[in-house]
From Swiss-Prot:
PANTHER family: IMPORTIN BETA. Residues 286-462 are annotated as: Essential for high affinity interaction with RPL23A. The modification N-acetylmethionine is found at M1. The gene is KPNB1. Mono-ADP-ribosylated by PARP16. This is Importin subunit beta-1. Residues 329-342 are annotated as: IAB-binding. The lineage of its organism: Eukaryota, Metazoa, Chordata, Craniata, Vertebrata. PROSITE patterns: HEAT_REPEAT, IMPORTIN_B_NT. It comes from Homo sapiens (Human).
Amino acid sequence: MELITILEKTVSPDRLELEAAQKFLERAAVENLPTFLVELSRVLANPGNSQVARVAAGLQIKNSLTSKDPDIKAQYQQRWLAIDANARREVKNYVLQTLGTETYRPSSASQCVAGIACAEIPVNQWPELIPQLVANVTNPNSTEHMKESTLEAIGYICQDIDPEQLQDKSNEILTAIIQGMRKEEPSNNVKLAATNALLNSLEFTKANFDKESERHFIMQVVCEATQCPDTRVRVAALQNLVKIMSLYYQYMETYMGPALFAITIEAMKSDIDEVALQGIEFWSNVCDEEMDLAIEASEAAEQGRPPEHTSKFYAKGALQYLVPILTQTLTKQDENDDDDDWNPCKAAGVCLMLLATCCEDDIVPHVLPFIKEHIKNPDWRYRDAAVMAFGCILEGPEPSQLKPLVIQAMPTLIELMKDPSVVVRDTAAWTVGRICELLPEAAINDVYLAPLLQCLIEGLSAEPRVASNVCWAFSSLAEAAYEAADVADDQEEPATYCLSSSFELIVQKLLETTDRPDGHQNNLRSSAYESLMEIVKNSAKDCYPAVQKTTLVIMERLQQVLQMESHIQSTSDRIQFNDLQSLLCATLQNVLRKVQHQDALQISDVVMASLLRMFQSTAGSGGVQEDALMAVSTLVEVLGGEFLKYMEAFKPFLGIGLKNYAEYQVCLAAVGLVGDLCRALQSNIIPFCDEVMQLLLENLGNENVHRSVKPQILSVFGDIALAIGGEFKKYLEVVLNTLQQASQAQVDKSDYDMVDYLNELRESCLEAYTGIVQGLKGDQENVHPDVMLVQPRVEFILSFIDHIAGDEDHTDGVVACAAGLIGDLCTAFGKDVLKLVEARPMIHELLTEGRRSKTNKAKTLATWATKELRKLKNQA
């Protein structure tokens, strides 16, 4: 009884009662989990107990079996499997008995069954479960509640378990699901549970989709369910079609004409948002699939082979029907629309963009009449839809086809930036931004640039949602203007460009925008800072005085922000404060990159003092630490060897960054900075190396360090060796052993992420070896004898390269590094290398691949390495 009372108190409005109940349950779980779970399952299984107690008991069981965090979930599953088999059997019997006895939804028992199943099925336990669940659904005497909760359990299992674990059960599971979906099933609740279960099972029913008769049957049942009068079932059935289209595109031709086309077009026209959304999503998915198929076709053509799968061009064929519905849907905006609400109007915009990318030129004649007819419509909804449609089709069709249309539309768009409706102004600003990004020649022409700049500068004072889009337009415009400027051959940046005359005003207005009191709305503040960064980055020489001024403003702001820290009261203040620090650091990086060396020397003391203050105050915020480390990196780049005077003061914070592996982005930034310091300070970094090397080696040996940090550390060993030359000898043995271990790493080849990671790891090992060989051999004509310390490892290094050559997943980056290292080994060790390479013909194939590579680095290094090998051959 006591347990029931306590479970009922888990929903108590009295906070003390509630906390006491939670503490009791936590203690019970720790003291004796098996007994506790058996007791809970007893409470759950007894229909005489209150609904509150049963739901709470189910929740406790479920939460002891599963978690959103995959690592914790795996621990819980192991903990469950370690419980005595009798106790587990008792819990399983009780939760199975509960199915069908609950009068509330969703069923708690179904979640418990799924939690246990996901732990036991992968280790071949509980074999009787799936047959039992199938029997519950197919037994003609089962109640509605029994069928519904059982199908929910099946759905949860399918959702959470690795599809491979259920492959051999797919027929039975599918039988139960289809049974619940049939149009003869009287209960819509059962139909809904079955349709949701099907949605979760589609990944592992591939064998059933491969068989024509079974596929016909599944498709028939799903299509019938899309006509169910219950909206919930209709939406779930449409979700199935959306997913089937992605998974089984190749099989859809039979169903497209007779069924899918009509069903989805009808759904798109529905007044019920959820239904319309699925209809639109279906065609967005068709576009995604057909774009992938287009890429596959062009790759196959390049390699002179037929593609594995071909596109049926459904999107192109449906344009004339889809576009009118989508443009009509664009007119259903909500005036005070919240950015986060996904609705048919937004989905229609995305679908139009995908259609434009997928069907290219073919879409223009279908959309143009709507734009022309409504861009000056007195009803703001139609004006907005016309501008939106125009913005959506700018990417995909040939620029040459769009350019005359855009130039013709420019005066109207500039006018619409001052429209009485804020929605129209917002969309017009977005469309102008898209034009600046995708068809900049239309924006930077002599006729429209001046009026466009005028209207954009005014737009910065508009509502946050409009101003935010204007900021983005400025970013794209600056980049386009910079690329279009004339550059003298020997110069890196143009002397002047088309934004020069308005540059100072634009920068001033953007700085004012970053200070707007409503800057936290619609990301306006960060958009304005990002725009400022782009404009400074893409500025011509004659804008330099304005860049100098901006640098001083940013430095002043950084100091002001650091003084505000003591006044922070609330968490939301702290978040805004941290965001502002990060934005200022990022902006500082961009202005520093533009500042000339002698100017940088004048301001570096103040900049460094601010950054050091930031490190002292932000011990708690990883994001800010990361941005501050990146800003130091930029200062190091700009100052070069002159940075040495700050090293003593900065050293402790570099150490803190390297130790902060819990926030691995911070650690990555610190490791990257070590590389920059090596390049800038060269041998002057020697006094700091012992400490840095110790921290780097500790991180490599610590399994809690995020895996992405490790390749960067290996690569930085090469930077250190290159900087300190012979002084690296004292670290050589331990580093070479570490590299030998790392270069033998193996991963699961079916996991693409791990294949990428392996390439990263290998590239870093090669970079490290390269730095060590170059550092020890020195840059004099005669090779320094120190390099002979590496000689015993040369054969291993070449075997490693040979192993890479034989792995077809290697990247261009790996090929480039391997080729560079081969060349360095030739110059350091001479004819010994030749013998070892000759014995490994795969290495020659790797160099041939490098010489034919499309990336410059691989081509250059492979050609050089081949020449070095040839030299040795001629000497021999």
